[in-house]
Amino acid sequence: MVTDSEYVNYDGKIVRSKKTAFAEGQRAAAIIGANLICGSMKTKEVTYNSKLIEFLNEFIDDFKIDLIYTHWDHDVHQDHSAIGKATLNAGRHIPRILMYRSNWYQTSDLFRGTYYVDISNVMDLKIRAVKAHATEYQKAGKGWIEFFKNENRNNGQEIGVRYAEVFEVIKYLNMIRRKP
């Protein structure tokens, strides 16, 4: 994550503290077997600039990244779109970049998902991981989960499985290795 995920509303009230956001992120990461790494940029203040690109470059170099999953660069959330755009720049030498829609709001651009992953056997884990973000879940309500279930079900119907995640492919180099 690029930000500390603290969320402050329009009147300055903290809706989700850094501590709470980190704890929720840790719980979600544990559910899916991932490690959570957080940046310190402020939520709603991320901009597409060289500072963000260099942050991502350092991350890519430090962790020897060869596959990137990033926010869709046309997401209406300003942080998400800035991160998506900056990732295209920072990931220019990475052989595989996939973008995803991370929220349920609409935009004037079409998401062009063409790479499907069957998540039928892990959909319950996805739901648990989303619900682990308790402050977001409380704010959005049960409709948030229903949206993801319906979207993943619709994606699955397109390819003949129960649930699927779909990504927009920026580039995807398949690497075939010779057997020794």
Question: Where are the model-predicted features located?
Answer:
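The feature marks non-catalytic terminal segments
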Residues: R27-I32, L67, I94, S102-P180
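Glycine-rich, phosphate-binding/catalytic loops in enzymes
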Residues: R16, G84-L88, Y116
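Short, well-ordered secondary-structure micro-motifs
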Residues: Y10-G12, Y48-S50, H80-S81, D109-F111, ...
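Active-site metal-coordination segments of metallo-dependent hydrolases
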Residues: K18-A21, Q78, S120
